[in-house]
């Protein structure tokens, strides 16, 4: 999905007053990050790390997991497409409705697609990969983390891709990598772009078994993550949680908007988690 994702003000050449086409937190203050990157701008005169190892080390330490279970990517989208490429031609099941990049990536790499409208994790006929967005985009639904762990353990023949790009936008408990180091059929996808409200820098990562991480590294291009993005990621991790979204305020504003829209005749606002 190259066009149609949203947040495309560049196409219109004018200031956008209110942009509802993207799910990024709108109240981020990136002033300190901007000043830091200005000081570090000289790094663009050199190639970045072929793999963002320095950032991976910081992430692994912060998460309390082995370094060989983390791979930093050029946004969560690169992670999705790399996974689809690694398992090219496999069968995939994608619950509906959900983020369309899973289907787009699977189609490019010739997956046999099937759909699960009920989001029932127990339904796995002949499918080998189960793609799950949790919290789900666009519905906001959050599946119980204990249920996910149970299903992953009970079905070792299948692979599970759980996209947790929006984990910082919910109060519901979600899976933590430290609790899943024994799950060798699981890939967790994360978005630092959304976590720290920096979508223009494209920064994400995959948590999985060392074997899967190594295989993913073998098919990706070098220098996939640029030097500025790597520096921004390290800065954000050091300053966390100062750089995190104001979740209570964000959710309160979402509720206010929901109530205002619901008051309009002919407008039905669907509930979210």
Regions flagged by a language model, labelled:
Residues 1-46:
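N-terminal "arm"/small-domain region of PLP-dependent enzymes with the aminotransferase-like
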Residues 84-107, 119:
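Conserved PLP-anchoring active-site segment centered on the Schiff-base-forming lysine
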Residues 66-70, 164, 184-185:
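Short acidic capping loops at alpha-helix termini that bridge into adjacent secondary structure
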Residues 75-85, 162-171, 178-179:
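Glycine/small-residue-rich loop that forms an oxyanion/phosphate-binding "nest" at active or ligand-binding sites
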Residues 114-170:
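Active-site phosphate-binding strand-loop segment of PLP-dependent enzymes
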Residues 185-262, 266-269:
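PLP-dependent aminotransferase class I/II
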Residues 48, 60-82:
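Short loop-beta-helix segment that forms the pyridoxal 5′-phosphate
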